[in-house]
Every structure is written in structure tokens, then in C-alpha cells.
Amino acid sequence: MKMLYDLAKKRKTVRRFKKEKPPLEDLIYSLKVANEAPSGMNAQPWRFLIVEDEKLKGQIRRVCERSEKTFYENVRGRLKEWLDEKRFTWRKPFLKEAPYLLLVFSEKSAPYSRESVWLAVGYLLLALEEKGLGSVPYTPPDFREVEKLVNTPSELRLEVILPVGYPDDPKPKYPRNEVIVRYNTF
């Protein structure tokens, strides 16, 4: 039963991808795994959109970078210090360079839809790792322009964009903090 733990230990954030395009079947497999996630009232409120069109990926990158640039220009205080320390930038080349973008949506009217979608994303990330694929959960400051680009139905809300491909990112996974467990009370 150690296999799941090993996958979780191995999985890391990937922002750089090889140009080689993974088989679509590996993404479909990963989405089937995500579909097995628990959901509030068994609503299964997730919807997935695979984007592989180069022009559309470029448009998504442009609208995301525009909202990121505005965000970075206006951020202040401790958050700005943290972003600078980590060398984060408004540029998001992985949105164009990844062979695929997986857009994950929630049904607005479903009970506990956001919480449920993020459970599915956790399953999805582990399934991608199992297939040797990397990703980073990316949440732009403003999803509305992306929703327009992909003709999102009004009953859905974009929750996260996952660039997906074979990792070409040599940096190691950051160490995990020790698990701290309390019993009954804090």
C-alpha cells in the first residue's frame, strides 16, 4: 500500500515542459481517476476541458499575463516581499509551452462544488504523476477572460488551469513540513 505515498512524495510542481506531446490516452486516464473523487452529495460537479490548440493556448497565456501584470503592479506589503523572495513573476510561459492545458470547472449550483472540484484535482495530480506527467495548479487573478475564450457555459465556473506535459524542470521538490497531529483538542 506504499505506492500512493510514493507517488505523493515524488510529485512536484512543474513549470517547464519538454516539447514531446504525451499520448492523449494518459490525460484521459488521469481524468477518469479524477472522476472517482468524492464529492458533496455525490454531485460530481467537475467538468474538464483539454486545450491543445496552439493559438488558443497563446490567447489564454496573454489574458492571464495581462491580469497577472496588473496584480503584480498593485500588490504590496508582505505578499510582495514573499513574491519577490520566491522570484515569482507575472510572466507565465508554461501556459503556452505545455503540450496541454487542462481547464477544470465547477458547476456553480452544485452543493460544495468548489471543495469537491479540488478533491478531484488532487486525484488528477497523482494520476498525472503516475503517468510520468507534470503540472502546476495555476489560478490567475481573473478567470473571466479565459472563460470567455473557451465559451464557458454560464452554469460553470473555471477553478484552475493545469498545464500538462513531460517535466523538463530540474529543480528538486521542496521539503515537506513534519506532519503535526493532535488528538481530540488543540
Swiss-Prot record:
Domain of life: Bacteria
Annotated Pfam families: Nitroreductase (PF00881)
Keyword Plastid: no
Binding-site residues, L-tyrosine: M41, E68, Y72, K92
Keywords on record: Flavoprotein, FMN, NADP, Oxidoreductase
Binding positions for 3-iodo-L-tyrosine per the UniProt entry: M41, E68, Y72, K92
Disulfide cysteine pairs (residue numbers): none
Biological process, per Gene Ontology: tyrosine metabolic process
CDD domains according to UniProt: iodotyrosine_dehalogenase (cd02144)
Cofactor(s) for this UniProt protein: FMN
A Gene Ontology molecular function term of the record: L-tyrosine binding
Effect noted on mutating F88A: Strongly reduces affinity for Tyr by more than more than 2600-fold and reduces affinity for I-Tyr by 18-fold
Consequence of substituting M41K: Decreases affinity for I-Tyr and Tyr
Sites where the protein binds FMN: R11, K12, T13, V14, R15, P38, S39, R176
EC number(s) reported in the record: 1.21.1.1
Protein family membership: Belongs to the nitroreductase family.
Cited function: Catalyzes the dehalogenation of halotyrosines such as 3-bromo-L-tyrosine, 3-chloro-L-tyrosine, 3-iodo-L-tyrosine and 3,5-diiodo-L-tyrosine. Activity towards 2-iodophenol is weak.
Full protein name: Iodotyrosine deiodinase
Species of provenance: Thermotoga neapolitana (strain ATCC 49049 / DSM 4359 / NBRC 107923 / NS-E)
Protein encoded by which gene: IYD
